[in-house]
């Protein structure tokens, strides 16, 4: 425990703050990229279902359109 306290207090406060902020920025960036990927994936599936519903309605198959919508 003594070694930990010595190491923790021997570094400058500014360096530890910058290191913590850099780590948080990496995590925030990775999270943002994940949000973008999942958003694009969801938009693709919504577009795909919308096209399938439109085709079913054009063919006059209301049951198929409702089944796709209910997914």
UniProtKB/Swiss-Prot annotation:
Cytoplasmic topological domain: 1-24
Entry superkingdom: Viruses
Name this polypeptide is given: Holin
Keyword Phosphoprotein: no
Assigned keywords, A-Z: Cytolysis, Host cell inner membrane, Host cell lysis by virus, Host cell membrane, Host membrane, Membrane, Signal-anchor, Transmembrane, Transmembrane helix, Viral release from host cell
Membrane topology of this protein: Single-pass type II membrane protein
Periplasmic topological intervals: 46-71
Subunit details: Homomultimer.
GO biological process per UniProt: killing of cells of another organism
Function description: Accumulates harmlessly in the cytoplasmic membrane until it reaches a critical concentration that triggers the formation of nanometer-scale pores (pinholes) causing host cell membrane depolarization and endolysin refolding and release into the periplasmic space. Once the pinholin has permeabilized the host cell membrane, the SAR-endolysin is released into the periplasm and breaks down the peptidoglycan layer. Determines the precise timing of host cell lysis.
